[in-house]
């Protein structure tokens, strides 16, 4: 029995390496498989790692808008005592504090991030205001008024050893984890920025289902055994009877 030759399409789950942009991984996949119709279900900043849901072929790229609305889960590290303009480790340092919060203070502040909260998007973000992305204003040295957005979060403290505060958070679409780190710093009175971020889950897809993103730069790497359907099941080749 032979296997039918079909167009390459499906969901490819990739563990994005640190230092890579999401779009550089898409370009690597385009070069590897020769398919230009590739989308995703949510980008990650260059310093972040973890689950990237890559959608291959027209049938699956059409699912992008649906998958973007699904909940996500992250592990993160907030660095206390220092503030940056971008709220993360890639930004310019704009403040320092010598205050060392107590565990009691940390527990009280982290307990706030449960259920629905109001969050303001950071200036260094792709959120559009008056037709321009916020980071375009920020790069011009401008800070403009931004509207609050209601997001849903479930934050769990993992470990606190000053200056690092480790936590895991499940959240709804549109949640900025670096804004959570920044707000934690404000609440604790010492400032903070997001030092590490790893996406553990995106919708039904988890990190243990992902392939190493570095494989996409290996000539001849076979993606077929790793393609999944929209429910996360491995796709099986269609036999020719």
Swiss-Prot record:
Q: Name one GO biological process term.
A: mRNA pseudouridine synthesis
**Family according to the record:** Belongs to the pseudouridine synthase TruB family. Type 1 subfamily.
UniProt keyword Transmembrane helix present: no
Look up and give the organism this protein is from.
Answer: Chlamydia muridarum (strain MoPn / Nigg)
Q: Which reaction does it catalyse?
A: uridine(55) in tRNA = pseudouridine(55) in tRNA
Coiled-coil ranges from the UniProt annotation: none
Keyword tRNA processing attributed: yes
Classification via CDD domains:
PseudoU_synth_EcTruB
Instruction: Look up the EC number in the record and give it.
Output: 5.4.99.25
PANTHER family listed in its UniProt record: PSEUDOURIDYLATE SYNTHASE TRUB1 (PTHR13767:SF2), TRNA-PSEUDOURIDINE SYNTHASE (PTHR13767)
Pfam families cross-referenced by the UniProt entry:
TruB_C_2, TruB_N
Q: Identify this protein by name.
A: tRNA pseudouridine synthase B
- The active site annotation covers 45
Q: Which superkingdom does the taxonomy of this entry point to?
A: Bacteria
Q: Which InterPro entries match?
A: PsdUridine_synth_cat_dom_sf, PsdUridine_synth_N, tRNA_psdUridine_synth_TruB, TruB_C
What UniProt keywords are attached to this protein's entry?
Answer: Isomerase, tRNA processing
Q: Which Gene3D superfamilies did the record assign?
A: Pseudouridine synthase (3.30.2350.10)
NCBIfam families this protein is in?
TruB
Q: Which GO terms describe its molecular function?
A: RNA binding; tRNA pseudouridine(55) synthase activity
HAMAP family reported for this sequence: TruB_bact
């Amino acid at each position: 029995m032979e296997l039918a030759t079909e167009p390459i399409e499906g969901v490819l789950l990739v563990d994005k390496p640190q230092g890579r942009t999401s779009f550089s991984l898409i370009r690597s996949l385009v070069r590897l498989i020769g398919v230009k119709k590739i989308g995703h279900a949510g980008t990650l900043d260059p310093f972040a790692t973890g689950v990237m849901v890559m959608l291959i072929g027209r049938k699956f790229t059409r699912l992008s808008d649906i998958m973007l609305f699904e909940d996500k889960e992250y592990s993160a590290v907030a660095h206390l005592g220092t503030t940056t303009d971008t709220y993360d480790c890639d930004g310019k340092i704009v403040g320092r504090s010598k205050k060392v919060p107590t565990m009691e203070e940390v527990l009280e502040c982290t307990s706030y991030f449960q259920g629905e909260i109001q969050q303001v998007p950071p200036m260094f973000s792709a959120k559009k205001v008056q037709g321009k992305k916020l980071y375009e204003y920020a790069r011009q040295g401008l800070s403009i008024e931004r509207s609050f957005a209601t997001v849903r979060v479930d934050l769990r403290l993992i470990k606190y050893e000053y200056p690092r505060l480790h936590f895991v958070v499940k959240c709804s679409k549109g949640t900025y984890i670096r804004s959570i780190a920044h707000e934690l710093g404000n609440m604790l009175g010492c400032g903070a920025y997001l030092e590490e971020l790893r996406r553990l889950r995106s919708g039904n897809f988890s990190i243990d289902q992902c392939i190493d993103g570095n494989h996409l730069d290996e000539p001849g790497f076979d993606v077929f055994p790793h393609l999944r359907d929209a429910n996360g099941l491995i796709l099986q080749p269609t036999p020719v009877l």
